Amino acid sequence: MSRKVLIILAIVTAAAFALAGCGGGAGAGAGVAKGDTGPLVDKIIIDVRMDQSIAAKDTVEGKTDIFAYGMDASVFFGLPQADREKLSVYPVPSGSWSYLMNPIPNQAPYVWKTKTGKEYFNPLAIREVRYAINWLIDRKKMVDEILLGGGEPAFTSMTPGQPGTYRYNIIATKLGMTERGDEKRAIAEITAALEAAAKLPENSGKLRKTGQFWTYKGEPIVVKFIIRVDDPQGRLPAGRYVADQLEKAGIKVERLEYDRSKAGRMVYGVDPAAYEWTMYTEGWGAGATRRWWDVSISQMYAPYYGYMPGGATEGFWNYKQDEIDKLAMKSYNGWFLTDEEYWNDNLKAQELGLTEAVRIWVCSQIDYFIANKDRVTNRFVYGLGDGLNGWSFITADVKPNDKGEKILRATQFSAKGGLFMSAWDPVGVDGFSDTYVSMIVEQCTMREYFEAPNTAIDTPYLVQWDLKDVQSNVGPDTTGDGKPEGLIDVPADAVKYDSATKTWKKVGSGVKSYSTAKYTVKDSVWHDGNKIGLADFVYSLGFQTDWSTKDGDADLAYEEAYASQYQPTLETLKGVIFNKDGSFTTYYDFNWPMDKNRVAYGGLLSPKAGNPGRPTMVPWTITEAIGLLVTEGAASGTVYAITEDPSMTQIDVASPACVADLKAKLNEMVEKKHVPVYVKDHMKPAEAVDAYKKTLAFIEKYGHAYVSNGPFYISKIDSTANYMELSAYRKGYPYKKDYWGKFFALEVTQIDNVAIPANARRDADAVIDLTVSQFTYPSDQTKPADKDAKVQVTLISQDGEKAYPAKYVKDGSFQAVIPAADLAKLQPGSYTLVSESKFADEAPSVKPGNLVLF
């Protein structure tokens, strides 16, 4: 397949969504023979290469089956054509780059004094300087010269081309941002901002331009720029380019070229007040194929979510932006009446994020995932917006060996040869934070629900729901808090956990909620042999409430960063009824008029008690032992925490020392016949002891404490050799081997090309010709789209949007016409044109472009 076709395929398939039913409940049931469930392969062997080119060559030669790392265009197209023909290629726009600023103190006079007494003038504390960097960067140059065309300029975290993202991305256009930037404008604005700062009384005579660079007290003001050296063909040259641009603006740059381990530890694990860095070259994996993007607003721009400088960590200096927090929480938690209100709030938050410019996006990157075509015998499932994910290995098939075993060999990339960067902490917000380990544990986890990799629809998995049991009823705000009013009566005997008294209390009469839903739990078993049941859900809700609530200064069962993510969601829960049949019914303030499945998602409980936003899940036995290690102490005397705090040791269920302490704590819990306070009414001491013993047996056998519930379990970790084995889990996983491959098969469209007139006139019709294909996901074999495809273009102007249907010309060819009468109403200039294709009522394939009117 040619380079051009691969790039087009990547961009357009990212938006190829279609409507799918929630068939998660139709997996293997009672009577399914042992061995019929789980993944297609029996084992996965995961190793690491320190060079992407070597890993790619090993995949070509069959030394490994899948290179589970998204290569950029320069590496992939550096392979000879003969080698590429031996590969099954999955090109996905799943990567992106951004620049994170440390804006401390984020207020005039922009000077920060560290604990050592050293004073720094931070130019990135000036909002106008940060904002001007958007024009200092030539994004098109970065894509063309560094990514070799394998990506697109980006201004937001929303992947260009995916449904709904153009609404966010057009804000940058309205602000005047362009892919080429405007170096002259940027330098002028940075200079003006620094001149204004120099006139402040506190900086008078201290801040001045001396020769090429600005100085403070006679020393150059400096941006401490951490640049990822272990991405030598990507973020390293990109970082050096931006450093050169900053120096053109008179700001000296200290180029701190570090690998991912050191960089990540300094940027995300150290208090920004230490002033060890002020700018960082971030790289992101998409994390999921998305239908709704409010979570990205929270994650990438809102301080409450814990991804902005300071990480919402108690005791750290934290960037604050209350208006973004308010808008982001409102959308993320479903506190709105209409889809119009949802979009208005999100777009306002996006605009604030762009103008605050604490995190600046520069490009999306097409990642090329590859598999050996001879060894891997099928096209496995992958995320149209995030590439290889938790569904890839479960649906991949390989040729059996001489013993009849199917062993899949997968390779990761690490410049330093290490598989893991972050601690394996399944409770704290910082655990499992690197994409490498996330990719691995995702194969081992059956989450409560998932966003489908091909449609992004919220779909039941461990927890099941029927849309007939999902109801919403809301009215306008009557209290002045800006939130809708719930109109559903919550039963008086519904309960919530009270952390102060350590009891479950009835909510009483008069409580209302937006929505209610009933859920059942899929019949399944943890990897340690404990059955997953209602007690798992009761425990996790109690734990989340307890650790998110500070009951006095001496409360050790509280962690600020953890609370910052869980508290807003917990506040939406108005009450829950734990039903005698093992199901549960929740009453909650979450409204989503656009999608009823999303309403069901909003009321979910989960056995996952911590590590929000990560593809992890462990049973209550592990979580309780972790909690007691933190609050009671460890046998070794180590002081543990569920956060990255340099003064303590972060929990790590793969670290031998931490595992030893967890075993000691579990044995202590056995001796005491300990029953967690959250489930004291749902469990007898003997049942708790039996659960602890099963967990201990798993840890003893496999040497780690990542007990989960997915289609694979981690059967071996060799941190010295950077080698892992995942083994098929069949006894307690409820879905048949071939279930997911059939479930995800989907006929979708993709827009291959949009021919927009180069010299459109306002006194003549504008004719747009579109080339559209169709294919059955996850296959890459396309054919011209037939007449059942519905195609349209939407012209976006300052006055709004107007859609124009495209007529079917022949298979693969469609034509839309924008009448001259409509164009005559517009002023000369450039207008965004969004092309869409679909088969039915599903979200469309989307391709944005520009119509220039003369």
Feature names for model-found ranges:
Residues 24-42, 75, 82-86, 123, ...:
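Surface-exposed, Gly/Pro/Thr- and Asp/Glu-enriched linker/hinge segments
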Residues 32-78, 252, 738-769:
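Ligand-site clamp/hinge motif
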Residues 297-301, 305-308, 368-418, 428-434, ...:
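Long beta-strand-rich cores associated with HINT superfamily self-processing modules
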Residues 23-50, 81-95, 395-399, 416, ...:
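Aromatic-rich, solvent-exposed beta-strand/loop patch
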Residues 125-248, 348, 393-411, 420-426, ...:
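Append "and occasionally in soluble cytosolic enzymes with long acidic Gly/Pro-rich linkers
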Residues 48, 122-131, 135, 179, ...:
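Extracytoplasmic/peripheral linker and loop segments enriched in polar/acidic and small residues
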Residues 76-200, 210, 215-217, 305-325, ...:
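Local pocket/hinge segments that shape ligand/substrate recognition
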Residues 84-115, 264-330, 761-763, 767, ...:
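Acidic-aromatic pocket-rim loops
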